[in-house]
Amino acid sequence: MNNMNKRTFLSLLLCVCCLSFLHAERVDMQQAGADVQGRKLNTALINSTIDRLNAHGGGTLFFPAGTYLTGSIHMKSNITLELEAGATLKFSENFDDFLPYVEVRHEGIMMKSFQPLIYAVDAENITIKGEGTLDGQGKAWWTEFFRVLVDLRDNG
C-alpha cells in the first residue's frame, strides 16, 4: 500500500470513529415519560432505556431538574447517567424494589443481598456525571438494619 492509500485509509477510519461517537444517542428522561415529581417509580423506564441504548452501542440518559423515584438501576457498557443541577435520583424506600437478590461482595465475602442502588456486572465505560443528587434514602435502610439487630439480640 503506498503512502497515499495509507493516508486515505487512515483518514476514512478516523472519520468513521468520530461519527460513531457523534451518533451516541442522548435521551432526555423527562421527555421519555419519566415522572419528575418523585411520586411514581421510574425503574422500568430507566432500565429499558439503558438496555435500548446499550443494544445500539451506548448513549446518555439525561435527567433534567426534577425528582426521579427509582429502584435498582442496572448499568450496561457505554452508558452515561447525566444529572442536571436540580435533578435527584431518589431511590425507593421499598426494599422489594431491590429484589431479586444478587451476588455482591461485602468486606471481601461473596453473598446474596439486595441489588445495589446502581448495579453493573461485566460492564465497562460507565459514567455518572453532573451536578444533580443521588439520594439513597439511607434512613429507611438504617432503620431496618437496627430493627434486625434488635430482633437478633432479643430472639437469637
Spans of features found by a protein language model:
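Extracellular/periplasmic carbohydrate-active domains that bind, remodel
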Residues: 17, 21-156
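Bacterial Sec-dependent N-terminal signal peptides
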Residues: 1-27
